[in-house]
From Swiss-Prot:
Superkingdom of origin organism: Viruses
Enzyme class: hydrolase
Gene source species: Influenza A virus (strain A/Gull/Minnesota/945/1980 H13N6)
Protein's name in the database: Polymerase acidic protein
Gene label: PA
Subcellular location: Host cytoplasm; Host nucleus
Pfam families: Flu_PA
Keywords: Cap snatching, Endonuclease, Eukaryotic host gene expression shutoff by virus, Eukaryotic host transcription shutoff by virus, Host cytoplasm, Host gene expression shutoff by virus, Host nucleus, Host-virus interaction, Hydrolase, Inhibition of host RNA polymerase II by virus, Manganese, Metal-binding, Nuclease, Phosphoprotein
Length: 716
């Protein structure tokens, strides 16, 4: 289409159209239909005015060639095609000299013979529909409207066609030719369907009563009334320089706009320091499950019953010992806590009837691990406001940490497929409305791509743990309740499976506010030796608790089984969000949908089936030091899901800040790639805002490192 436009229209028209699009931040290379429409409209405006003059007697005449010395004045003033400032200047000057009412919107022409502005319309739809839209938009009796269509129809205000038959026939013939040329190149259908209706701007409605008083109270200083403020705002030229706008606003502001070039941006500075450590609420790639297939035991579905059944599948328990102590904790207490869990589970089995929940004895090791009686005593402010040296605790700045390789490994693992399916087809939720076939189809394709993904396992594990912990926090506030960490899935053959990852012991939980903290101790099974990456496990005390027989390619091997124990905490609001982790599925489905939509609008048909079934096509997944990584559509689905899940698992103020601030830099870089010549002021301040979020959070550090890869490749 772009080539067609450049061949078909006069270069001056093409240049004007490009300028107009650039003024509104649109790209002629991308919005090619719009490009063609603007050129067509410009050409019709020029043809409308061509050869029409007013002679000395004030009569309208048509002169195609003739005496260059004749005293002729152009009958039409062309307003369309000028830049906005110039166009309004022309309109204002016409209004001042002729006394015609000033139009609300920029018209296309002024007719000196009839003394009226003219709005020209060129439509690919029905002329009367377009005429009504135009009339509705400009709502002015004074501006004359004249609409042409590509099928040779026309419509004008009061059927007054302004021009003679022959001049109008020239315009209609030209439009018909453009249509045929487009059709012969297969461009017409797309062009015809891409026409949008006129955007009508809401009429100003009168504000009265309370709203009026509130409006008057909330004006910026120095404005006496709402009208006076509106007039000021309307006086801003939409494309004046930013510097000008700023200087109008305040005498103190002085901004110098610096051009943003390919050489301008520098990489983000990542912090230095010891490598960052794992901070998720439960183990991810390092978790180990004890599982039962086709569970049918008595009390199946009751977490404690399921947990005991899973524990019984393992026979390699041994006397536990500490292999990686916690730097600052009392490590023997962690060891005693695990022994206590084993002993109390044994006690349950010796009882006649297994209880549905288990509250642990409040031993000294658990009291220590759960921070019992550790909180400083709270005093009423009235009682202590007279204390002379009352002060807030000094809190240390968080220690800076560097990015460690384990974070990328965790992410890669989250994108992988597992042997089991973690969600049923309807997990994303049926739509309430009688959903069209397409949406269900998309959902089913997407579910098929992600149901076996490890990120989906993390979702279900997170939902289970948070739900169980929130329930126990409300139901057993004072008890140290033992909560098994469980998930359910289906094997390749479709058999049900229940998995136990370990246990949580919850501390006292009188949670009044959303942010009140409940402490818990987590104990999770793993085959990962903590001594390989000790920095990752800084917050854990790790015990060796057994040996597991594993089937490998070379036969059976005996591997030590570890227990990762740590004290942790969460709050009502965090548990509420944890329970809603299934939203990650929805978020990534919507991202995939927008990709399908983009593809479908180019091809002008629904591309869902081709999108998911064309296995040969690859899609961009992300940036790495090697360049843009590509993969199958399934890989894209799983990567988007993993990102969404990690945003939930590693949610933090650092992530919020980094996402918001880095997005600004991203948009500037994208504008540069789209040749929009962006300018910036205080780029240093933006870098500062981004980098103050890079402290010690593993997920934020990984995202920053990805951002740097993106910068490198985007600016090549």
């Amino acid at each position: 289409m772009e080539d067609f436009v450049r061949q078909c229209f006069n270069p001056m028209i093409v240049e004007l159209a490009e300028k107009a699009m650039k003024e509104y931040g649109e790209d002629p290379k991308i919005e090619t239909n719009k490009f063609a429409a603007i050129c067509t409209h410009l050409e019709v405006c020029f043809m409308y005015s061509d050869f029409h003059f007013i002679d000395e007697r004030g009569e309208s005449i048509i002169v195609e060639s003739g005496d260059p010395n004749a005293l002729l004045k152009h009958r039409f003033e062309i307003i369309e095609g000028r830049d906005r400032t110039m166009a309004w200047t022309v309109v204002n000057s016409i209004c001042n000299t002729t006394g015609v009412e000033k139009p609300k919107f920029l018209p296309d022409l002024y007719d000196y013979k009839e003394n009226r502005f003219i709005e020209i319309g060129v439509t690919r739809r029905e002329v009367h529909i377009y005429y009504l839209e135009k009339a509705n938009k400009i709502k002015s009796e004074k501006t004359h409207i004249h609409i042409f269509s590509f099928t040779g129809e026309e419509m004008a205000t009061k059927a007054d066609y302004t021009l003679d038959e022959e001049s109008r026939a020239r315009i209609k013939t030209r439009l018909f030719t453009i249509r045929q040329e487009m059709a012969s190149r297969g461009l017409w259908d797309s062009f015809r369907q891409s026409e949008r209706g006129e955007e009508t701007i809401e009429e100003r409605f009168e504000i009265t009563g309370t709203m009026r008083r509130l409006a008057d109270q909330s004006l910026p200083p120095n404005f006496s009334s709402l009208e006076n403020f509106r007039a000021y705002v309307d006086g801003f030229e939409p494309n004046g320089c930013i510097e000008g706008k700023l200087s109008q606003m305040s005498k103190e502001v002085n901004a110098r706009i610096d051009p943003f070039l390919r050489t301008t941006p520098r990489p983000l500075r990542l912090p230095e320091g010891p490598p960052c450590s794992q901070r998720s609420k439960f183990l991810l790639m390092d978790a180990l499950k004890l599982s039962i297939e086709d569970p049918s035991h008595e009390g199946e579905g009751i977490p404690l019953y399921d947990a005991i059944k899973c524990m019984k599948t393992f026979f390699g328990w041994k006397e536990p010992n500490i292999v990686k102590p916690h730097e600052r904790g009392i490590n023997p207490n962690y060891l005693l806590a695990w022994k206590q869990v084993l002993a109390e589970l044994q006690d349950i089995e010796n009882e006649d009837k297994i209880p549905k929940t288990k509250n642990m004895k409040k031993t000294s090791q658990l009291k220590w691990a759960l921070g019992e009686n550790m909180a400083p005593e709270k005093l009423d402010f009235e009682d202590c406001k007279n204390v002379s040296d009352l002060k807030q605790y000094d809190s240390d700045e968080p220690e800076q940490r560097s990015l460690a390789s384990w974070v990328q490994s965790e992410f890669n693992k989250a994108c992988e497929l597992t042997e089991s399916s973690w969600i049923e087809l309807d997990e994303i939720g049926e739509d309430v409305a009688p959903i069209e076939h397409i949406a269900s189809m998309r959902r089913n394709y997407f579910t098929a791509e992600v149901s076996h993904c490890r990120a989906t396992e993390y979702i279900m594990k997170g939902v289970y743990i948070n739900t169980a912990l929130l329930n126990a926090s409300c139901a057993a506030m004072d008890d140290f309740q033992l909560i098994p960490m469980i998930s359910k899935c289906r094997t390749k053959e479709g058999r049900r499976k229940t998995n136990l990852y370990g246990f949580i012991i919850k501390g006292r939980s009188h949670l009044r506010n959303d942010t009140d903290v409940v402490n818990f101790v987590s104990m999770e099974f793993s085959l990962t030796d903590p001594r390989l990456e000790p920095h990752k496990w800084e917050k854990y005390c790790v015990l060796e608790i057994g040996d597991m027989l594993l089937r490998t390619a070379i036969g059976q091997v005996l591997r030590p089984m570890f227990l990762y124990v740590r004290t942790n905490g969460t709050s009502k609001i965090k548990m509420k969000w944890g329970m809603e982790m299934r939203r990650c599925l929805l978020q990534s489905l919507q991202q995939i949908e927008s990709m399908i939509e983009a593809e479908s609008s180019v091809k002008e048909k629904d591309m869902t089936k081709e999108f998911f079934e064309n296995k040969s096509e690859t899609w961009p997944i992300g940036e790495s030091p090697k360049g843009v990584e590509e993969g199958s559509i399934g890989k894209v689905c799983r990567t988007l899901l993993a990102k969404s899940v990690f945003n939930s698992l590693y949610a933090s103020p650092q992530l919020e800040g980094f996402s918001a601030e880095s997005r600004k830099l991203l948009l500037i870089v994208q504008a540069l790639r789209d040749n929009l010549e962006p300018g910036t002021f205080d780029l240093g301040g933006l870098y500062e805002a981004i980098e103050e979020c890079l402290i010690n959070d593993p997920w934020v550090l990984l995202n920053a490192s990805w951002f740097n890869s993106f910068l490198t490749h985007a600016l090549k």
